[in-house]
Amino acid sequence: MSLSKCSNVDLKSVAMNANTVRLEPSLGEYPTLRRDLVECSCSVLTLSMVKRMGKMTNTVWLFGNPKNPLHQLEPGLEQLLDMYYKDMRCYSQRELSALRWPSGKPSVWFLQAAHMFFSIKNSWAMETGRENWRGLFHRITKGQKYLFEGDMILDSLEAIEKRRLRLGLPEILITGLSPILDVALLQIESLARLRGMSLNHHLFTSPSLRKPLLDCWDFFIPVRKKKTDGSYSVLDEDDEPGVLHGYPHLMAHYLNRCPFHNLIRFDEELRTAALNTIWGRDWPAIGDLPKEV
């Protein structure tokens, strides 16, 4: 709870009855006024899962929970962090504008921290106090002052979850329980959208795809753009060189042809799942498939 909301709070009473938020690994427990906290068990993989129960987690992992499979970085995510690990001077003015969230000012702190802690796997700066964890949550909450540090931590998680929902990213990518990595990926999503692309891979559910399209950072899903008549289409072929500058031409060509169509054509399991009528009454049945497919 921020200072503006708790000016009349009896601090002595709160100190005796407050719940605590645990910051891992071994960074202490901090009081909070919230009463809806729940122990984050191994079966709880995302913040969204906790919130669907009407609760809030009491444990936050700065460097990811080693028991959470969604926090195990695959090569594709590490390549993403390596790609976007740059100095502020390397970004254009348009890109800096996309990096205003969460602090309100352009910053690459989270991108660099995620690269250090998750790609290089060097966490000594935070563990030894060289980097203060409070500064991390201070940035996410835009400098808001709190009486209790536990409230600052939980409000930061709420801000991350709100941003995830706004950008439409799946909870298996932004778990909400690993703030440094979550914010870095949300910033990468903002930068990717400047090129008309997205990290969103929730359509790709076939088990034959390993963490779909994230085995290589080049595989983004192209965002459709709105036409003057109100319909949507993928990026025009003429726009490819400008929008996908820096990407291999053949890969850019493949991406702009909407990879889902190619996958569903050749992956029988994915095609069966996509055409299952449980998704909606007007969903096409398998028997309605064109002969050429």
Curated annotation (Swiss-Prot):
Segments for region (Essential for inhibition of IFN-beta activation and interaction with host TBK1): 21-29
Q: Where is this site: Essential for suppression of TBK1/IRF3-mediated IFN response?
A: 21, 23
Which intervals of the chain are annotated as region Involved in inclusion bodies formation? 66-69
One of this protein's GO BP terms? symbiont-mediated suppression of host type I interferon-mediated signaling pathway
For whether the record's keyword set contains GTP-binding, the answer is no
Keyword line: Host cytoplasm, Host cytoplasmic vesicle, Host G2/M cell cycle arrest by virus, Host-virus interaction, Inhibition of host innate immune response by virus, Inhibition of host interferon signaling pathway by virus, Inhibition of host RIG-I by virus, Inhibition of host RLR pathway by virus, Inhibition of host STAT2 by virus, Inhibition of host TBK1 by virus, Inhibition of host TLR pathway by virus, Interferon antiviral system evasion, Modulation of host cell cycle by virus, Viral immunoevasion
Q: Where is this region: Interaction with host TNIP2?
A: 148-220
Stretches that traverse the bilayer: none
Q: Where in the cell is it found?
A: Host cytoplasm; Host cytoplasmic vesicle
Protein name (record):
Non-structural protein NS-S
